[in-house]
Amino acid sequence: MTSTSAHPKSKLMKRFAALGPYLREGQCQNDRFFFDCLAVCVNVKLAPEKREFWGWWIELEPAADHFTYVYQLGLFNKDGDWKAEKIKDPEVQEKLETTLRGFHKRLAEMLTSIEMRLEPAQDFSEQPVKLSA
């Protein structure tokens, strides 16, 4: 099944890719879309392939007239895997919140332009960052 009859997956992928470097096409499966942001490098002195990053990831799933999302904050480790972790440094937390809110705003605006809404998933009750008013 494509995302919606009015919005085929290929067109959505192009629109999502236009939002910036966040879309991870290789991790998008079926009707699920995966985005992430490596916002803060843990240690810039390490070789690039060994660096870890604080950041966030968000997954979208289509419904009839909207997309639902879940997101996490955490560590992107040197193995290339995300691990949900509590962010202890307030400056890092602020940077993650700022980049996540900015992406969420642009994503919601893009979806509105194609007459879709963006809503938290029903089972996503523990949101670490308030994304909208």
Curated annotation (Swiss-Prot):
The keyword Transcription regulation applies. Residues 99-122 are annotated as: Essential for activity. The keyword Metal-binding does not apply. It comes from Yersinia enterocolitica serotype O:8 / biotype 1B (strain NCTC 13174 / 8081). GO terms for cellular component: cytoplasm. Keywords: Activator, Cytoplasm, Transcription, Transcription regulation. It is found in: Cytoplasm. Binds to the sigma-S subunit of RNA polymerase, activating expression of sigma-S-regulated genes. Stimulates RNA polymerase holoenzyme formation and may bind to several other sigma factors, such as sigma-70 and sigma-32. This is Sigma factor-binding protein Crl. The gene is crl. Belongs to the Crl family. Its main location: cytoplasm. GO terms for biological process: positive regulation of DNA-templated transcription.
